[in-house]
């Protein structure tokens, strides 16, 4: 007499093996995708030098920890200056940023972006926009700035919203004679990006950088090297 249970088991066995193989393949693919995604995320720079945070932003590590990627600050910006970083942007995904060369911060007196932040990633303690610290302007193009070539350009000085304080022309002497060189007072500069936006060169001679880069703040690698 044929054991029907045994026959049924033999018939079902290949089907079970097929199901298991499919499950294992899917798990394997998911694992590879997860590992690849993590590797890509880990290899990306946390924030490119051209990417600036909204006014009131905490220092970068604290900001990334406090920001919940809600986008309320972006919605609150009346001039659509702020953007939420996507996968392809040079900043942690979902965090707000702006690029001074294309769209500088207009320094709204009531700082609506900071007021909209629910977590304090953009500090509510910032009440005077002139005290904002989004970055610092740095004259990086000593070879390209028109003033270093003996001409006189004052665009960056004239468009600065902290006029007469953050950027001024200072005289220096070299083989070309007396030059008028744009000079930034880092204690007054808010990092809005207006000077970089309006630089007449195709590659701006004055650039906005995160303050720790622009002022050369010492990092962990400097320990024991002096």
From Swiss-Prot:
Binding site for [4Fe-4S] cluster 2: 105, 108, 113, 117
InterPro entries tied to this protein: 4Fe4S_Fe-S-bd, 4Fe4S_Fe_S_CS, MauM_NapG
GO MF term set: 4 iron, 4 sulfur cluster binding; metal ion binding
Coiled-coil region list: none
Pathway annotation from the record: One-carbon metabolism; methylamine degradation
Gene3D superfamilies, sorted: 3.30.70.20
Binding site for [4Fe-4S] cluster 3: 145, 153, 156, 160
Alphabetical UniProt keywords: 4Fe-4S, Electron transport, Iron, Iron-sulfur, Metal-binding, Repeat, Transport
SUPFAM superfamilies for this protein: 4Fe-4S ferredoxins
Organism: Methylophilus methylotrophus
Function per UniProt: Involved in electron transfer.
Binding-site residues, [4Fe-4S] cluster 1: 67, 70, 73, 77
Protein name as it appears in the record: Methylamine utilization ferredoxin-type protein MauM
Domain 4Fe-4S ferredoxin-type: 59-87, 95-127, 136-172, 180-211
Binding positions for [4Fe-4S] cluster 4 per the UniProt entry: 189, 192, 195, 199
């Amino acid at each position: 007499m044929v054991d029907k249970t045994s026959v049924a088991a033999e018939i079902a066995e290949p089907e079970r093996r097929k199901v298991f193989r499919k499950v294992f393949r899917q798990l394997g693919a998911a694992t590879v995708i997860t590992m690849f995604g993590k590797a890509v995320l880990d290899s990306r720079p946390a924030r490119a030098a051209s990417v600036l945070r909204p006014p009131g932003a905490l220092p970068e590590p604290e900001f990334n920890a406090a920001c919940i990627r809600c986008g309320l600050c972006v919605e609150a910006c009346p001039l659509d200056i702020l953007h939420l970083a996507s996968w392809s942007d040079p900043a942690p995904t979902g965090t707000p940023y702006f690029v001074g060369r294309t769209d500088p911060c207009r320094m709204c007196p009531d700082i609506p972006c900071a007021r909209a932040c629910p977590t304090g990633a953009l500090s509510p303690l910032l009440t005077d926009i002139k005290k904002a610290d989004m970055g610092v302007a740095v004259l990086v193009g000593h070879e390209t700035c028109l003033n270093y070539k003996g001409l006189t350009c004052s665009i960056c000085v004239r468009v600065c919203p902290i006029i007469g304080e953050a950027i001024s022309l200072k005289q220096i002497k070299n083989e070309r004679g007396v030059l008028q060189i744009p000079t930034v007072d880092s204690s007054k500069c808010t990092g809005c990006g207006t000077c970089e936006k309006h630089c007449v060169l195709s590659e701006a001679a004055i650039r906005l950088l995160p303050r720790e880069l622009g002022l050369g703040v010492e990092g962990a690698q400097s320990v024991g090297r002096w």
